[in-house]
Amino acid sequence: MGTGFHGTTILSIRKDDKVVMIGDGQVTMGNAVVVKSTAQKVKRLSNGKIISGFAGSTADAFTLFERLESKLEAHPGQLLRACVELAKDWRTDKFLRRLEAMMIVADARGTLILNGAGDVIEPEDSVAAIGSGGNYALAAAKALIVHASDLDAFQIAEAAMKIAAKICVFTNENFTVEVIDCASKECS
């Protein structure tokens, strides 16, 4: 992966009336140096109604957050449409095409994965994960959903991320968590 900044794990779980997005805090330069262990890679957008997490270059991710915010302002309450419009720009714009990042975005109604190839993917099983530890977190979360059904969305997300952090050297346990509670006014 060269000497650029990389490495992260973002996981989103949708269970019962909650959507949980969790991300680790590690920023790594190259394959050998941790330059920050408390980065915030999960944030709220659109006046708190949408949660998003990114993997990849931090500067690129902030550019994408800004672009997504403008698409959400142009298409209020339409997460899918805003994401499709962002994906179109991402794929066709000379500058954006060079951005190296992936995002998971979620609102009360759905969860989407966006990537630089212009894909907008709705994950199966209400679980999505990206980043270097994404496959580990995804597998752990799916196993916990099936075999530990008494756990809530937050408990599943936290346990799955702890497993990913033990396996992926680019993921740590300094988690940032955002939750959408669909049983509250937050989803109105």
Curated annotation (Swiss-Prot):
Under PROSITE patterns, the record lists:
PROTEASOME_BETA_2
InterPro entries assigned: ATP-dep_Prtase_HsIV_su, Ntn_hydrolases_N, Proteasome_sua/b, Proteasome_suB-type
EC number(s) recorded for this UniProt protein: 3.4.25.2
Q: Which GO terms describe its cellular component?
A: HslUV protease complex; proteasome core complex
Record bears the keyword Cytoplasm: yes
Enzyme class, broadest EC rank: hydrolase
What are this entry's molecular-function GO terms? metal ion binding; threonine-type endopeptidase activity
Sum up the protein's function in the record's words.
Answer: Protease subunit of a proteasome-like degradation complex believed to be a general protein degrading machinery.
What is the name attached to this protein's record? ATP-dependent protease subunit HslV
Q: Which organism is it from?
A: Neorickettsia sennetsu (strain ATCC VR-367 / Miyayama)
The organism's lineage is: Bacteria, Pseudomonadati, Pseudomonadota, Alphaproteobacteria, Rickettsiales
